[in-house]
C-alpha cells in the first residue's frame, strides 16, 4: 500500500500547558475544525473527547496522553491536506512523566498559556522537558476573553521566566469581553471569525485605526526576527527592501526549527477564536519528521556501535513504544512512534531491550478513545498496537534483521509511598494483577512488598498520583483497597570521609572455613554527580586480594546501600575505595568477601557523620492578596523557606521550598485558610539534610 500523505506533510505535535490554561478545550477545537468532531465537547460538562478516562472527566484534568490523528488544509484551504498527529499531555505536576514521554516522541509542540495567569510554575517544568529533547515550539495564549487577559504581558513572561525569545505572530484585538479577533502581523490584516458557524469561516479586514501604530511596531519586530535567519535576508532588510510573505514565513520557520524563537499566537478556544490560525502556524512553522535530526541508537553488534535511523520508508523498521494503556475491550494498547521503515499488521518485530520477538496482531490509529483499524504504518506515524506481550514504556521495536536499540527514556524516582491492602481476602490476587498492570502503564509508579511487614507498598510522584491509582483499581479492576498513611522516601548519606576502615569475616575452626578481609575508604559524592549515586574504586596493588573476589566486595557494599544503617532507607552519593586486605588460599570465597565488605561498610558509615536526607518540594501558591499573611505563616510552620513572591491580576504568587513530609493534607488546609480561593502546585526539587529533631523522630519510628 502506498503512502497516502507525503511525510513532509506530517506534523507530530504535543499540546502542552499548565492546569486550567484551557488545553483540553483547545484540543477539542482542533478536532472540531479539522472535521473529526462534529459536536464540540466542553470540559465543563465532562464531555471532552480527549479526556477519555472517567476520572479525567470527573476531575476536569487530563491524566493520560491520548494520541489523535487529524487532517488540516488551512483556514482558507490554502494547503494540501496535512496529517496532524496530536498528543494531548497532562498539565498536573504529578503526571510530569506523561509529559516527559510524549516530549520524547514529538517533533514539535504548542505551549498553551492562560492570558490571565500567564507562565505558571508547571509551565517552567514542561519548558525544561521540551528543552531537554530540543523540541521546536510555538505558543498559544488562550482565554483572551477572560477578565484580566493581557496578551503582551504573557509574551513578556515567556521571555522573563522561561528565558525564551518570543516573537508575536499576532496581536489581540480587544481583550476580556471586548476580544473580537486578531491582527495577523505577517499579512498585516485583521482576522474576524464568524460566530454563526462556530468560527469555521472568517474574513480578513483592515486593522482597526487605533491599533495601526502598535501593529506597525510589532510587524517591524517580526520582520527583524525573520531577517536574522540569514545574512542574505539581513542585507536585503538593511538595504530597505521589503521581505515577501514567503520569505518571512520561510525564515521564521527556520528559526523555530533551530529553537531560536518562539512564535506566539493568541485567541479564545472557548469562544471559537484563534485556534484556526494557530493550526495554520503549526503547518507553517513546526517541523515535519524529515525536518528534525535522525534518531540515535546503538547497534546490537556486541560493541554498542552508535547508529541512526532517518524518517524514511526505505530504511529498516524502527519504532519506540512510548505508552502502554489498558483498554477495557481489547486489553493492552501499546502506543508507538515509527521512526523509520514500514510495518504491517501480522509482521513479527524484535524488542531488543527484552530480546523478545513480538507479533503485530492489529494496528489501530486512535482518535481519543475511538479507534480505526489500519493495515500498515510508516515512518512518522503514531499508532497503537493491540496484543504486544512484553513491551514496556521506552522499549524499541525494530526489524529483526536490522537490530537497533533507540535512546531510552529517563523516568524519575518516586517521592511518596503508601501501604495498600485489599478490603477482602478474595481481592488479594486481583489487587496484585491490577497493580502489575498499572505499573506496566506508568513507569513513575512502583509496587513492591515490604519484607518486614509483608504489606504491599505503592509509590509515585505525589498524593494525587496515588489517589488516582487507588481509584483506578476500584473502577477498572473492581478492587477496593484500604490505604495507609503516606510515607516519605527518605535517603541516607555521609558527610565526611573516613579512611582505613577494616572489615574481616573469619570462621576457621577445622574443615573448610571462611575468610575475607578488606580495608576501605568511604567518602561523600557531590549530589547528582554520579547517576547511580555510588562509585566503587578498586585500588588493590600487588594482588593482596585476588581479582576474582573484587566484584564480591562491590556487591557486598551495594547490597548494604539498599537499606542504610540509620533507618533502613537507601544510601546515596557514596564513594568507596578498596585499597588493602588479605585472603586465604583455601578458606576465602566470594561470600566471605561480601560479608567482610558489609562489615566494613556498616562500621565506616557510623563514623562518617551519617545524615538522613528528606525530599524538598518546590511549592508555588497563588492566593488572594488578603490571605497572603496566613498562607506565608502556614508555610513557615511547615518548615518552608520563602523564595519570593510577586503580584498578578488575581492576587499574589508565593514561591517556597518545603519538606514533603510537611505537605501532607496541605490542599485541605489551604482551602480552609482562603475559603477555597487559593491554588498551589508542588514538584520535587532536591534532597537535603533533615534537621536533627526530624531525623531522630524518623529513626525512632523505624525502630532502629
From Swiss-Prot:
Q: List the PROSITE patterns hit by this protein, alphabetically.
A: G_TR_1 (PS00301), G_TR_2 (PS51722)
Q: Does the keyword Protein biosynthesis apply?
A: yes
Print the keywords alphabetically. Cytoplasm, Elongation factor, GTP-binding, Nucleotide-binding, Protein biosynthesis
Asked if the keyword Manganese belongs to this entry, the reply reads no
Could you name the Gene Ontology cellular component terms for this entry?
cytoplasm
Q: Where does GTP bind?
A: 17-24, 88-92, 142-145
Any one GO MF annotation of this record: GTPase activity
Q: Name one GO biological process term.
A: ribosome disassembly
Functional description taken from the UniProt entry: Catalyzes the GTP-dependent ribosomal translocation step during translation elongation. During this step, the ribosome changes from the pre-translocational (PRE) to the post-translocational (POST) state as the newly formed A-site-bound peptidyl-tRNA and P-site-bound deacylated tRNA move to the P and E sites, respectively. Catalyzes the coordinated movement of the two tRNA molecules, the mRNA and conformational changes in the ribosome.
Q: What's the name of the protein?
A: Elongation factor G
User: What organism is recorded for this protein?
Assistant: Pectobacterium atrosepticum (strain SCRI 1043 / ATCC BAA-672) (Erwinia carotovora subsp. atroseptica)
Amino acid at each position: 500500500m502506498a503512502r497516502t500523505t507525503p511525510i513532509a506533510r506530517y506534523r507530530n505535535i504535543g499540546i502542552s500547558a499548565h492546569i486550567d490554561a484551557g488545553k483540553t478545550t483547545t484540543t477539542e477545537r482542533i478536532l472540531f475544525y479539522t472535521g473529526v468532531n462534529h459536536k464540540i465537547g466542553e470540559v465543563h460538562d465532562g464531555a471532552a473527547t480527549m479526556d477519555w478516562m472517567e476520572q479525567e472527566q470527573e476531575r476536569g484534568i487530563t491524566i493520560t496522553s491520548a494520541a489523535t490523528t487529524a487532517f488540516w488544509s488551512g483556514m482558507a484551504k490554502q494547503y494540501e491536506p496535512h496529517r496532524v498527529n496530536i498528543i494531548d499531555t497532562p498539565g498536573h505536576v504529578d503526571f510530569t512523566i506523561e509529559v516527559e514521554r510524549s516530549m520524547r516522541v514529538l517533533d514539535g509542540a504548542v505551549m498553551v498559556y492562560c492570558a490571565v495567569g500567564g507562565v505558571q510554575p508547571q509551565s517552567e517544568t514542561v519548558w525544561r522537558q521540551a528543552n531537554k529533547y530540543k523540541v521546536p515550539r510555538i505558543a498559544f495564549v488562550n482565554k483572551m476573553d477572560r477578565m484580566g487577559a493581557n496578551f503582551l504581558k504573557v509574551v513578556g513572561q515567556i521571555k522573563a521566566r522561561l528565558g525564551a525569545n518570543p516573537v508575536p505572530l499576532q496581536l489581540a484585538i480587544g481583550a476580556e469581553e471586548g476580544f473580537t479577533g486578531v491582527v495577523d502581523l505577517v499579512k498585516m490584516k485583521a482576522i474576524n471569525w464568524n460566530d454563526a458557524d462556530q468560527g469555521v469561516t472568517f474574513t480578513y479586514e483592515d486593522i482597526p485605526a487605533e491599533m495601526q501604530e502598535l501593529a506597525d511596531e510589532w510587524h517591524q519586530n517580526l520582520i527583524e526576527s525573520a531577517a536574522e535567519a540569514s545574512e542574505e535576508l539581513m542585507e536585503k532588510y538593511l538595504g530597505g527592501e521589503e521581505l515577501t510573505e514567503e520569505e518571512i514565513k520561510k525564515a521564521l520557520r527556520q528559526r523555530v526549527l533551530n529553537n531560536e524563537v518562539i512564535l506566539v499566537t493568541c485567541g479564545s478556544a472557548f469562544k471559537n477564536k484563534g485556534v484556526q490560525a494557530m493550526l495554520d502556524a503549526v503547518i507553517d512553522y513546526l517541523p515535519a519528521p524529515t525536518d528534525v535530526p535522525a534518531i540515535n541508537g546503538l547497534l546490537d553488534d556486541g560493541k554498542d556501535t552508535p547508529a541512526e535511523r532517518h524518517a524514511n520508508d526505505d530504511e529498516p523498521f524502527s519504532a519506540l513504544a512510548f505508552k502502554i494503556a489498558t483498554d477495557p475491550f481489547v486489553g493492552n494498547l501499546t502506543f508507538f512512534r515509527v521512526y523509520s521503515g514500514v510495518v504491517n499488521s501480522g509482521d513479527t518485530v524484535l524488542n531488543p531491550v527484552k530480546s523478545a520477538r513480538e507479533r503485530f496482531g492489529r494496528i489501530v490509529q486512535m482518535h481519543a478513545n475511538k479507534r480505526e483499524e489500519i493495515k500498515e504504518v510508516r515512518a512518522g506515524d503514531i499508532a497503537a498496537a493491540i496484543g504486544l506481550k512484553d513491551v514496556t514504556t521506552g522499549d524499541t521495536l525494530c526489524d529483526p534483521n536490522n537490530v537497533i536499540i533507540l535512546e531510552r527514556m529517563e523516568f524519575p524516582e518516586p517521592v511518596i509511598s503508601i501501604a495498600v491492602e485489599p478490603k477482602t481476602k478474595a481481592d488479594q490476587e486481583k489487587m496484585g494483577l491490577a497493580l502489575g498492570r498499572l505499573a506496566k502503564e506508568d513507569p513513575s509508579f512502583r509496587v513492591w512488598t515490604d519484607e518486614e511487614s509483608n504489606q504491599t507498598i505503592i509509590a509515585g510522584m505525589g498524593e494525587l498520583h496515588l489517589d488516582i491509582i487507588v481509584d483506578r483499581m476500584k473502577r477498572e479492576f473492581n478492587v477496593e483497597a484500604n490505604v495507609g498513611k503516606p510515607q516519605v522516601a527518605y535517603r541516607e548519606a555521609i558527610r565526611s570521609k573516613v579512611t582505613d576502615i577494616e572489615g574481616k569475616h573469619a570462621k576457621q575452626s577445622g574443615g573448610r572455613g571462611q575468610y575475607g578481609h578488606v580495608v576501605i575508604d568511604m567518602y561523600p559524592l557531590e549530589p547528582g554527580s554520579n547517576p547511580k549515586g555510588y562509585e566503587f574504586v578498586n585500588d588493590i596493588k600487588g594482588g593482596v586480594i585476588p581479582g576474582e573476589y573484587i566484584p564480591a566486595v562491590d556487591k557486598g557494599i551495594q547490597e548494604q546501600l539498599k537499606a542504610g544503617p540509620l533507618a533502613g532507607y537507601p544510601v546515596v552519593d557514596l564513594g568507596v575505595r578498596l585499597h588493602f586486605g588479605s585472603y586465604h588460599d583455601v578458606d576465602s570465597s566470594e561470600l566471605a568477601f561480601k560479608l567482610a565488605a558489609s562489615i566494613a561498610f556498616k562500621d565506616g558509615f557510623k563514623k562518617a557523620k551519617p545524615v538522613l536526607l528528606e525530599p524538598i518540594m518546590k511549592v508555588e501558591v497563588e492566593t488572594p492578596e488578603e490571605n497572603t499573611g496566613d498562607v506565608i505563616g502556614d508555610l513557615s510552620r511547615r518548615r518552608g523557606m520563602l523564595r519570593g513572591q510577586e503580584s498578578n491580576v488575581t492576587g499574589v504568587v508565593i514561591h517556597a521550598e518545603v519538606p514533603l513530609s510537611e505537605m501532607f493534607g496541605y490542599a485541605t488546609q489551604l482551602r480552609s485558610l482562603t475559603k477555597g480561593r487559593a491554588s498551589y502546585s508542588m514538584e520535587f526539587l532536591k534532597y537535603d539534610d533533615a534537621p536533627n529533631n526530624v531525623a531522630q523522630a524518623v529513626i525512632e519510628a523505624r525502630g532502629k
